[in-house]
């Protein structure tokens, strides 16, 4: 568990239905060549969240390197292309979220960063390009800086949300819920 949290890495939760053994091995090799790791976790049980989908968690050490500009260009490119591949694989799958009294819905990819100040979450509802991943990474870095400069900023949720003109904005959870009529 410590390696998962302290290495430069990405954690995929409940990805077993989206990737073959060969695809997992290929991703692992790409990451390892650049001193990064990719981990696959399975979580069972009922989940209750306003953000449902397959989680892609960028671990703390990787985020610190992104924020500090210390991630080598080749490793940064591997991260971007891997995120594109992972998100698009999820979006092109036949996976569905099934809830009582509702029609099945396509699975979204959720990129998350967990930190002392809370979480940064981006729910991605469509295929994504390298350029869009770069925008998301820049928004994550900005949200991380905001979170760490907020007095008494513990346990806050920062949501990276796509606007109608395809830009990204950073919202606190109450603002996001209000914007999307969820409260």
Describe the function of each predicted region.
Residues 1-59, 83-183:
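Short amphipathic alpha-helical segments that predominantly mediate membrane engagement
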Residues 59, 63-75:
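Short, glycine/alanine-rich hydrophobic alpha-helices that insert into or span membranes
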Residues 70-86:
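Short hydrophobic alpha-helical membrane-entry/anchor segments
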């Amino acid at each position: 568990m410590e390696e998962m949290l302290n290495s430069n890495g990405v954690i995929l939760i409940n990805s077993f239905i989206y990737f073959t053994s060969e695809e997992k091995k290929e991703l692992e090799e790409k990451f390892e060549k650049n001193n990064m790791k990719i981990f696959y976790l399975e979580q069972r049980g009922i989940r209750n969240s306003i953000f449902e989908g397959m989680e892609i968690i960028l671990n703390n050490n990787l985020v610190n390197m992104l924020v500090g500009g210390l991630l080598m260009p080749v490793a940064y490119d591997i991260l971007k292309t891997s995120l594109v591949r992972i998100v698009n694989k999820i979006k092109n799958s036949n996976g569905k979220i099934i809830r009582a009294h509702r029609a099945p819905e396509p699975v979204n990819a959720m990129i998350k960063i967990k930190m002392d100040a809370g979480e940064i979450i981006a729910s991605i509802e469509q295929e994504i390009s390298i350029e869009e991943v770069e925008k998301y990474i820049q928004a994550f870095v900005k949200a991380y800086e905001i979170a760490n400069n907020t007095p008494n900023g513990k346990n806050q949720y920062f949501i990276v949300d796509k606007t109608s003109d395809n830009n990204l904005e950073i919202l606190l959870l109450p603002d996001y819920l209000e914007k999307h009529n969820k409260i």
